[in-house]
């Protein structure tokens, strides 16, 4: 993944999307922890996709 930013972004997006579908089944404490992690993941994904776009890559959708 280190040398494959597109793969890393796709994996992060997949993990984020799958986590969203599981939020309803979590207890309050797990929900808080999960949403924090998901926010960090999304922030990183935004950063990574903007870096990729600046380098001439395609944005992950």
From Swiss-Prot:
SUPFAM superfamilies with a match to the protein in the record: 14-3-3 protein (SSF48445)
InterPro entries (alphabetical): 14-3-3 (IPR000308), 14-3-3_dom_sf (IPR036815), 14-3-3_domain (IPR023410)
Region forming the signal peptide: none
Pfam families according to UniProt: 14-3-3
Superkingdom, taxonomy of origin: Eukaryota
PROSITE patterns named in the record: 1433_2
Family: Belongs to the 14-3-3 family.
Descriptive protein name: 14-3-3-like protein
Taxonomic source organism: Zea mays (Maize)
């Amino acid at each position: 993944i280190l040398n494959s930013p597109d793969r890393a972004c796709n994996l992060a997006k997949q993990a984020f999307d799958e986590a969203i579908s599981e939020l309803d089944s979590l207890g309050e404490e797990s929900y808080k922890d999960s949403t924090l992690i998901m926010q960090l993941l999304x922030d990183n994904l935004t950063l990574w996709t903007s870096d990729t776009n600046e380098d001439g890559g395609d944005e992950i959708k």
